[in-house]
């Protein structure tokens, strides 16, 4: 699978990574859209995004009180749909914490259309819930917590259109290896 991030660009707006990818499973096409929090500048290692003089040389579409992020995500979703995606799964590192506003997964969903599922991270939360998109449609949002405590499973029933999510505790997924004790 490719690394995807619709909102990671250089300062001229040129994408650093592909924003989306469409994969085919039988006769169903699924578009995957990558989204990273603009908080990456401050919550990771800032020097990764700076030149030798300390000037930022990248953007995460952080401007206009969230609108820049919503717009670039919408463009990637629309492009995936134009390529024939039957479903769009957003892969986000946005989170739901209030201090991450206006870039939370909830806000991205509320300001876009066309996303069916958003698999999220960043806030290390554990949940599966629905949020309304800009058109008032339900979008499943799920997070699996932190440090591989859980594995997430999302199922799209292509006959009914129902989308479900399940959390599975990692400890329940594999027996301990006798040789390593892990």
Residue ranges and their predicted role:
Residues 1-176, 180:
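Acidic, metal/ion-coordinating pockets
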């Amino acid at each position: 699978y490719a690394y995807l991030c619709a909102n990671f660009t250089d300062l001229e707006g040129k994408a650093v990574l592909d924003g989306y990818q469409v994969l085919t499973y039988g006769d169903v096409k699924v578009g995957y859209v990558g989204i990273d929090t603009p908080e990456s500048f401050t919550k990771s290692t800032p020097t990764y995004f700076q030149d030798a003089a300390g000037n930022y040389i990248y953007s995460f579409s952080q401007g206009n009180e969230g609108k820049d992020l919503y717009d670039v995500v919408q463009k990637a979703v629309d492009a995936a749909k134009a390529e024939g995606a039957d479903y769009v799964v957003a892969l986000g590192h946005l989170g739901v914490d209030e201090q991450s506003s206006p870039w939370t997964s909830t806000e991205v969903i509320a300001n876009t259309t066309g996303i069916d599922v958003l698999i999220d991270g960043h806030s290390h939360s554990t949940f599966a819930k629905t949020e309304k998109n800009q058109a008032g449609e339900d979008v499943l949002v799920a997070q699996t917590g932190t440090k591989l405590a859980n594995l997430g499973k999302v199922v799209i029933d292509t006959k009914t259109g129902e989308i479900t999510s399940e959390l599975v505790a990692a400890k329940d997924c594999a027996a301990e290896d006798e040789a390593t004790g892990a």
